[in-house]
């Protein structure tokens, strides 16, 4: 198994596949907070929050806080795609964010609370999108990729499960 990509690398779906799998993406986005909370509780009970998932990788604590940071960005990217004409989405330095004191000194419970509320709003928003809204586009300045809303949802559906895979590696 590739520990960096425990569920495999992201492959962006074509438009037809993304459209056909919207329900799956919504399910994954909606269920992620409970899954991460369950894993976090086990990691905490076994005193493993500060163990990296692989040599040179983030600790479980960093992964959990990263999910909150990244998915806040994701939610805002989805909202911008729904409300602006082909917005430009900007990257951020996630590796540097993972070293800041709000990651190293704050209990993971804070990020679990963020994920619960955020994913409820995000899944609710996406569940009400029309076909035309799912086809709205945004340009990601860091990757140079133009995303449709459904391919953006596919990306973050994968992203959550990707990091769940990292948390499971720590528990092994």
What residues fall within each predicted segment?
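A structural signal for long alpha-helical coiled-coils and helix-turn connectors
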Residues: 40, 44, 82, 130, ...
